[in-house]
Amino acid sequence: MNAPSTMTDKKPEVEHLQGENPPKDTYSAEDTATAILRKKRKPNSLVVDDATNDDNSVITLSSNTMETLQLFRGDTVVVKGKRRKDTVLIVLTDEEMEDGVARINRVVRNNLRVRLGDIVTINPCPDIKYAERISVLPLADTVEGLTGSLFDVYLKPYFVEAYRPIRKGDLFVVRGSMRQVEFKVVDVAPDEFGIVSQDTIIHWEGEPINREDEESSLAEVGYDDIGGCRRQMAQIRELVELPLRHPQLFKSIGIKPPRGILMYGPPGTGKTLMARAVANETGAFFFLINGPEIMSKMAGESESNLRKAFEEAEKNSPAIIFIDEIDSIAPKREKTNGEVERRVVSQLLTLMDGMKARSNVVVMAATNRPNSIDPALRRFGRFDREVDVGIPDPTGRLEILRIHTKNMKLADDVDLEQIAAETHGYVGSDLASLCSEAAMQQIREKMDMIDLDEDEIDAEVLDSLGVTMDNFRFALGSSNPSALRETVVEVPNVRWEDIGGLEEVKRELRETVQMPVMYAEKFLRFGVTPSKGVLFFGPPGTGKTLLAKAIANECSANFISVKGPELLSMWFGESESNVRDIFDKARAAAPCVVFLDELDSIAKARGASAGDSGGGDRVVNQLLTEMDGVNSKKNVFVIGATNRPDQIDPALMRPGRLDQLIYVPLPDEEARFSILQTQLRHTPVAEDVDLRAVAKATHGFSGADLEFVVQRAVKLAIKDSIEEDIKRENETGEAPADDVVMDEDASVSQVQRHHVEEAMKMARRSVSDAEVRRYEAYAHQLLTSRGLTGFQFDSADSNTNGPSFGNDGADDLYA
């Protein structure tokens, strides 16, 4: 019972619950949605700290805390931890402790499923009785090779020397004769907990318990094992925990509690994990139905299996029935050919309707294809609520990483926030795989110190293991989001410095793609959605594809490269479906850059091709609708590249779709010099090679043409170097290896002038002057047809209007 004085210590927000109406602005919509997650801090909620003594029956508090809780030294209390676990302990006091803290040892913490820093709740337990009979069994690995009586050496001294309350299911450790033995309380009579007295009968004989069996229950999933879906967890707890634990809430307000919840979302986001956590934390009976398992070839058996599952759950209420992969047993009836599936769907409908209103059974189902489920199941009264368990944001990913690394030994340089920021599109299972791969990489690095033939690995080696940031970097390089496994998704390794010239184009790209990803809050503050599309056009070989790769790398976005023709299919409707799939995957892995290369092959002006069945037009229509539907909340950028801009459907190039039209011209002399430097930055070049002269002589060459010149020159240098080595080897006979190293300078080790001159003889332009003129005319036409170049606001002292667009108003159709 709490002291009366503490009632005034409650926070104002808790008091609102007792008043008539809380102030309207107390909670935001987000707060209301996650209200169930807010723990109301009570005086008897204490923070766990490590015990200074190692007694399994003791909890130590400060004298102020004991006074607040009206407890005395030696009182017996019930301590509640996580996952509905509790135990009974004796209270001791320590003057030096701070208030609001409870000290318990490791064994008690394991029994309560809590860690240091977690919260436990303490309540007095004045009516605890003496136990008549208890049954304890040792854990097998702690009694191996032990001789003598367990009772005389361990149990008798443990219980005779002290006043010990115990609870059924708890573990306790006893020290004696140079070793410690761990026991489990298998049974306590007459109650679940009691105090062991002189008259208590102790049964201790029996088969020792395997630690694996014990630890499987320790590894049960709880709410603290789930990260990245705070809002969804709140929804599920509202709909499941409240009806199961407090059905009277619904009764008193006069509504029926929810019957079912459908969770949907990509694979690996934690749908099944959530259902298990809710079952463990509510203490409900958990009945798992894997979709395909209940199907049977015998007539009527599939429906019978379903009926049995529901009957079993009602007998063991409160219960949760969890149907995994529900789309396999409840597909749309009009689309299934099999009679069995139809009957199973009908049976599921009648069972969910037939559940008694307050039978304390909740049905949960999970799928990653919600639209293939029969619509009759998705109405109120069956699956009342649908919870979208989506891909986590950076904060969610950080939560998940912390959960997966809480038992890992991490080096000091590991920055989990940085990893969370870089893992766009990763779901919980991907992050678990990432942590596991990083740990494996650390083990691989230490392989030379590990002797696999030895039974025991040296303790020093085990202590030296620690996962570093480099291990995580390696794991990041070798993994990608599971949503994009079937699409070739890569964060390319092209950087801005790999692209020579094009400074103006790079600046525009940074503004369009990099800024919305890196400064999203600025766009929110100004109340605009950033543009989502860019079209590069220009002659072949000017670096359009390279630019798209570089921008995806610079803002750490995922990159999906789609070659135009590979979207087209001979089957009716397949091409549009391919376009849809690409955009769905991009939205799932946002921020993502979708790069449509050779856009003119799939987005030709509609109506131009009279011969086909309209397949090309349908693809264009699908592209248009997808680009309008690139959700403003998702950072999906579409970059198109073409060297035939006049053939692309004009509807694609309006503002709101591919609104940034960027002309990538042939490089000028300065840009050509920059490209040559970029191409040769890792190549040894003789000092007398004048790249300026090469840049001057290659007027009209594209970046690809210059790359050909460089490759040709390097190839000639390598050829000369090999010939020089062979010649020298023939002259000196079998020269020893160190002589070869000494004479290295004598061989051709650089690209020299004559190599470049020879390469220039083979050089050729890939773009003719006529083509360049055509591109420039098109770019000029776009520039002049689009801009109100003369517009200015009226100045304060002037009454004249600014220059109008076109001629005076007489010719204006809308005047």
UniProtKB/Swiss-Prot annotation:
Keyword annotations of the record: ATP-binding, Cell cycle, Chaperone, Cytoplasm, Hydrolase, Nucleotide-binding, Nucleus, Protein transport, Repeat, Transport
Gene source species: Schizosaccharomyces pombe (strain 972 / ATCC 24843) (Fission yeast)
Designated name of the protein: Cell division cycle protein 48
Residues bound to ATP 2: G541, T542, G543, K544, T545, L546
Top EC class, one word: hydrolase
Annotated Gene Ontology cellular component terms: Cdc48p-Npl4p-Vms1p AAA ATPase complex; chromatin; cytoplasm; cytoplasmic side of mitochondrial outer membrane; cytosol; Hrd1p ubiquitin ligase complex; mitotic spindle midzone; nucleus
Region Disordered, residue ranges: 1-30, 794-815
Gene designation per UniProt: cdc48
Bias type Polar residues, positions: 795-804
